[in-house]
């Protein structure tokens, strides 16, 4: 049985993590520099928010950060931006950040604080990494993110052994979604390393789609993936992936209603039944007679689709 709830204050939650054992989740919107804390048990406005513009230090705060992925590792959340160009195809340094925040949760609330300093050279590392040379990321980085073969990084997940997995919405080389393992995120944000350690972790057949979100389910030792088109086409599907380089991803049947999922959080695991909440990109929906992104902040909202998948 599925249900839909609404959260206020933003038109999307392009990156989010649930804080284990609690009803809280922390979400970023791709358009601003604010992390918002929501309570799943009482959907509505954020219970708290944290402003990050002074920490991320964009050259122009009017430029969007395009935060797209989040991964919880212990009491730290890693966040990654798209590392792509803007919608006009212009390079924007505000979209080139890997950063971390500390997080602690109690029944009363959530505390979030920046950790270390943002790493700004991940795009250079991706372009130069010998293991990634076949995917021509240098050429991809020169294209608009929603062009065929552009560059758009949207998924981030923890991996057993301490790595993070980066999931690419674009490019989709030879029709397969690209997953790259980042081996030293902690050293990068704590300024103990100057270059990312990168290797190919997966080339997934997602029906020609890229990765919009990826989430690790430790109880099941499996990843759940929201797959979608590299452009605005409404073509979404959920997959389960065991996580090995040669493992195949398996499609899951979920009725997405009219949601446009770009993030998911796992809320409960009961055997093979995994309870998830899919967070919808509702920037194009109407709010107060205007497109959500153009509406007054208090009118903005995004939806969560709560459902169960069998893996």
Question: Language-model segments: which ranges?
Answer:
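Sequence/structural signature of beta-propeller domains
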Residues: 1-311
């Amino acid at each position: 049985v599925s249900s839909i709830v609404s959260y206020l204050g933003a038109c999307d939650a392009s990156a989010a993590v649930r804080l284990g054992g609690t009803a809280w989740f922390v979400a970023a919107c791709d358009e601003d520099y604010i992390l918002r804390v929501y309570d799943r048990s009482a959907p509505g406005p954020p219970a708290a928010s944290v402003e990050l513009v002074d920490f991320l230090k964009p050259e122009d705060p009017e430029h969007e950060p395009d935060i797209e992925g989040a991964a919880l590792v212990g009491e730290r959340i890693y966040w990654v931006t798209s590392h792509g160009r803007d919608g006009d195809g212009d390079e924007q340094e505000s979209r080139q950040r890997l950063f971390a925040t500390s997080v602690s949760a109690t029944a009363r609330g959530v505390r979030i604080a920046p950790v270390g300093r943002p790493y700004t050279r991940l795009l250079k590392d991706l372009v130069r990494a010998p293991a990634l040379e076949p995917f021509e990321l240098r050429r991809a980085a020169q294209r608009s993110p929603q062009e065929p073969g552009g560059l758009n990084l949207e998924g981030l997940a923890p991996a057993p052994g301490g790595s993070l997995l980066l999931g690419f919405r674009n490019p989709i080389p030879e029709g397969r979604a690209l997953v790259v393992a980042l081996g030293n995120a902690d050293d990068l944000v704590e300024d103990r390393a100057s270059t990312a350690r990168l290797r190919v972790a997966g080339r997934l057949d997602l029906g020609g789609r890229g990765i919009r979100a990826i989430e690790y389910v430790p109880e099941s030792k499996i990843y759940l993936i929201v797959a979608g088109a590299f452009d605005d086409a409404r073509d979404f599907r959920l997959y389960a992936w065991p996580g090995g380089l040669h493992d195949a991803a398996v499609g899951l049947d979920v009725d997405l209603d009219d949601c446009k999922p770009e993030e998911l959080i796992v809320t409960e695991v009961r055997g093979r039944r995994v309870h998830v909440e899919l967070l919808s990109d509702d920037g194009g929906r109407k709010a107060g007679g205007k497109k959500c992104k153009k509406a007054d902040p208090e009118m903005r909202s995004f939806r969560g689709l709560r459902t169960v998948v069998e893996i």
